[in-house]
Amino acid sequence: MTDLGDPKIDLTRFFKESSVHEINGRKVDSKELINGVSMISMKINQDNVDSVKHFTTEGLSKEDRLSYVQNIKDALNSDVFEMSTCNRVLFVGFGVDSKQLESALLEIGSVDSAPFEHRNGLDVWRHLVKVCSGLDSFIIGELQVMSQFRGSVALHRQYGLLSDINSSFFDHVISANRIIRREFGF
């Protein structure tokens, strides 16, 4: 686990250090935090077009989007992040698993099922890095998704939809994105 391929990054010091840190006077276990992150998402294709349209916030006013995310947050009693682009919709939950997140979305959306992809823990971070760096875009390396991601993070922070601790998760996605874009020359 210390060698994850190119670029060669030595991660051994991270495995030796304590996973418990103090943030704003509160002890926080980083392993517990990352294991408590979940995501449900859909990338548009011919089989899920109607579902993506149903759950997207593209085209909603800022007030309607904020209300939608707040309703999800209230239903879960947990922080939630939402991002919609022209070809995907994704929701990240904190302190809930992906099944709970999906259940809340289905109930709020008044539908019985939707073809969400589920991710939990570190896989959420990995997928967000892949999406934001443009590696999962129709045009490899495009910058638009990163811009949309930053805008969505800023909106969630500005309106208190994410705590400081949970919003810092997205700072790590942005940092990793910079490294990937530099390594691949995007």
Task: Give a label for each model feature.
Residues 114-186:
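Glycine/serine-rich phosphate-binding loop and adjoining beta1-alpha1 elements at the start
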Residues 2, 9-20, 25, 29-137:
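A glycine-rich (often HGG/GG-containing) alpha/beta subdomain
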